[in-house]
Curated annotation (Swiss-Prot):
Family, as annotated: Belongs to the UBALD family.
Pfam families referenced in this protein's UniProt entry, alphabetically: UBA_8 (PF22566)
Upper taxonomic lineage: Eukaryota, Metazoa, Chordata, Craniata, Vertebrata
Lineage top rank: taxon: Eukaryota
InterPro entries reported for this sequence: UBA-like_sf, UBA_8, UBALD1/2
Name of the protein this chain belongs to: UBA-like domain-containing protein 2
Length: 172
């Protein structure tokens, strides 16, 4: 039973090494065996090997790590298509695609999201609601008035949230 358990443990370590380093399974097995199945030692030797210029032909490059995007020109193209002006629209592109939804999912939230106070708190600054000035700051009223936002925006704060949420759930 212990032999099977060791084999299983070695296979799990190989798989974990492949996921961590982004190399092939046979290379991971060789490095782990050379390091006497010490994961950190094998990982350290893998990345030290990557820094030696003479090993570039033999080295297996990482596949999909944050430092190396899957396809760099495509990533640049996607970033160049993102426009800040697309976010408030919330519509679908003319071709029927969902590029506006994707750009909203990748962009920061709408400006009113950052400017408005939390819904359960009274805003610090209240604009006068009537020209005669009947309302004062100590007059706390909890009616269903929308909280003021600065800078003023033409789109309501609840508008673009639904497409963003549906776009995010659709990508999973």
């Amino acid at each position: 039973m212990s032999v099977n358990m060791d084999e299983l443990r070695h296979q799990v370590m190989i798989n974990q090494f492949v996921l961590t380093a982004g190399c092939a399974a046979d290379q991971a097995k060789q490095l782990l065996q050379a390091a006497h199945w010490q994961f950190e030692t094998a990982l350290s030797s893998f990345f030290q090997e990557a820094n030696i210029p003479s090993h570039h032909q033999m080295m297996c490059t990482p596949r999909n790590t944050p430092a190396t995007p899957p396809n760099f020109p495509d990533a640049i193209t996607m970033f160049s298509k993102l426009r800040a002006s697309e976010c408030p629209g919330g519509g679908v592109s003319a071709g029927g695609g969902s590029s506006a939804q994707v750009s909203m999912a990748c962009s920061p939230p709408h400006a009113s999201f950052w400017a408005s106070p939390p819904p359960n708190q009274q805003p610090v600054w209240l604009p006068p609601s009537s020209p005669t000035g009947h309302h004062t700051l100590h007059h706390h009223h909890h009616h269903m008035h929308p909280p003021p936002s600065w800078p003023p925006v033409s789109q309501p704060a609840n508008g673009p949230q639904t497409p963003v949420i549906s776009a995010l759930h659709g990508q999973r």
